[in-house]
Amino acid sequence: MRSLLVAAALLVAPITAFAESAPHEFLDDAKALLVIGACADGTPPEKVKAELVTKHCEKVKAAQEDYKKSWLSVAKPWFEAHVPKTVPKTVVYPFAGGDLSTALTVYPDADEITTLSLEPAGDPRAWSKLDNKQMKTALAVVEKEISSLYRSNFSVTMNMIGAMRGGQLPTQLIFSLTALKIHGYEPTSMRYFKLTKDGDITYLTDDDLAKIDKIKNVAAKNRALSNVEIKFKKSGGKEQTYRHVMANLDDDHIKKDPSALAHLDKKGTVAGMTKAASYLLTFGVFEKMRKYVIGHVEWMVSDSTGLPPKVGEPAGFEYETWGTYTASNMAAGGPVTPQWKELYKAQPKRELAFRFGYPDKKLNGHLIIMKKKK
């Protein structure tokens, strides 16, 4: 009898250990934030005052509709016509801020989209811990940033620092959920994760959350909940995966913490994009990311903050210019302005009816396709 009990205990122990270490599922929080922050159809949770959500959503829905009519309705068919069906289904978007929506516009059929930025996804449970006064203030921040993103088509860096790193609500996450709402997707799973130094994913468990919940500082807690994975689909469609990774992608930070770049390396050949990226990809201190783009990207779309021609062409890329470019819109782009001007001058004029990322110095929209030569 004793041997049977020991055997039974040995069988139960692994099951118990597995249950304790199972990833925590945040889908209910995702659905709550879809209604509260992203203004999807539905009834807010009982804890949240419905009038606050109604007032918040009046402005947010107006911004979303304006975005769909003025930008998405023009940009979406353009990308459908110009993105080859053969591009990799794995997408990497560095310096993305909270911009999942553009990634879904360019690559709607992607199996996996990964964005990287300095901003954390943030605590998805925060909504349940705010009183009405705190919720009103937090929703005002979210509304301001969503309106700015969708009416400017890029986020202002200083705004993101406050709204996404220290926000009472997880603004970066709400941006992502708003993108799903606009494009007609429903989340099917939401988990948070950490990366090992080798770039592997380790999902957060209830034990991890118990430790995180001891953190009182909002910004610090948001940093502890920095990386999110959302699975989503359309009715009758395939399940797709979105991951956001908080990472500083300059060389010094990658040397100290190689996990993000190691994670990207594991993806193999990818499709890429970047825009409104403060020209970071052109800076000397981002050499590792330039090498990553050169070594892994097959097809990429950007504004003038992408990989400059004098770097891309020797590496085997060819470029196709769209819209009008006269000069970069900020001093940081000054060093690469001559390269882009020369490239635009050498190519035929191709009209572009929408803005993609930064405008040029004269507020012209421009877009660049970069692809590996066959």
PLM region spans:
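Positively charged n-region of N-terminal signal peptides that target proteins for export
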Residues: 1-4
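N-terminal signal peptide c-region/cleavage motif recognized by signal peptidases
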Residues: 13-17
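Non-globular targeting/processing and membrane-anchoring segments
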Residues: 20-150, 219-224, 231-374
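Short, surface-exposed basic-aromatic patches at helix termini and helix-loop junctions that form
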Residues: 84, 174-186, 234
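Short, thiol/selenol-centered motifs that function as redox-active sites or metal-ligating centers
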Residues: 96-107, 153-177
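Thiol-based oxidoreductase modules, predominantly thioredoxin-like and allied folds used
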Residues: 113-164, 188-212
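Conserved segment of the thioredoxin-like fold in thiol-based oxidoreductases
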Residues: 140, 146-148, 169-180
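Short aromatic loop motif centered on NTY/YTY
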Residues: 189-242
